[in-house]
């Protein structure tokens, strides 16, 4: 049984500036087996003062176009296809080599762009400037609202989508944020190719003039499906820093789903993400995911074992670090001069910190081993 969930919350910095949440998310599972997860992130910055509207409209457009796409496309186009990942188009030569699947996706993306532009044009034409906009937005950006050439920038946003049917799945992405997929081999990866243009505060966008060539996507129709796919806006990955930390958070979500149930997991996510924004990125947070509870239950030991392997490797690295520090101290025969004394003191403090970290890692290891033992006992 495939299930889904999504949640968006206002970022801590947005609360301070009285700015709305500029993220939007959606997820749904239908009786025919279609499952959809969407995350759209409206751009920050003074120029993009209606990006919250742009993100919401992007979600609506994507939902409509994907439903139409999956109901009208010949599924034989996907059936039997191995996992395939396609990067953003960098040249006209790539366009000439497109497969029938590539052409179908290009039509889907073109429809999304066209319908989104139509909706924001209607909104811009019929929605006067609010008091907040007049008070907080520089006049040069307010003037763009009346410009037929640049008004779409005011609504700019990114998008990330995962779609699963009984016969195939696909995902596509425009902009930043992270899509993480869990399956048996490799255990986790980012199925959608990354775009190096998305770096720091720079990102590709639905409002770009060349957006049609900036979509990246992937698909598979050979009978293999992920156990779970998580979509997270950049407020999520910016808070966790390294991908490994973000992956560990998603594993914790998976473990909680299996051991404590859906309701407790949702309650935890909706209380934790605002706090994570407060101590982390300060940005809006969005998460959406599709998962098979049966698959997660069957493979929960793999999730725990992955964490055990990570902790074991961290213990090994800490032990190597301790040996290096102890060797350094052993080589100091005299602390008569100031530089040697300072080096000696730093090495001792580093050893203390490494030992404290090792104790914490050993505790984590013990807890994880107990969790793994419990899984095998229950089975």
Which positions does each model-derived feature cover?
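Catalytic core of PPM/PP2C metal-dependent serine/threonine phosphatase domains
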Residues: 78-180, 215-223
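A residue-level signal for conserved active-site and pocket-lining positions in enzyme catalytic cores
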Residues: 41, 159, 176, 234, ...
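Short hydrophobic beta-strand that contains or immediately precedes a catalytic carboxylate
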Residues: 37-40, 172-174, 230-232
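Active-site-surrounding "flap" and adjacent substrate/cofactor-binding loops of secreted or lumenal enzymes
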Residues: 66-80
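C-terminal catalytic subdomain
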Residues: 201-379
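N-terminal entry segment of metal-dependent catalytic domains or homologous docking segments
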Residues: 1-67, 204-219, 281-282, 288
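Short acidic, Gly/Ser-rich segments with clustered Asp/Glu that frequently serve as metal-coordination loops
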Residues: 42-52, 177-181, 235-243
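PP2C/PPM family metal-dependent serine/threonine protein phosphatase catalytic domain
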Residues: 5-19, 126-152, 156, 181-224, ...
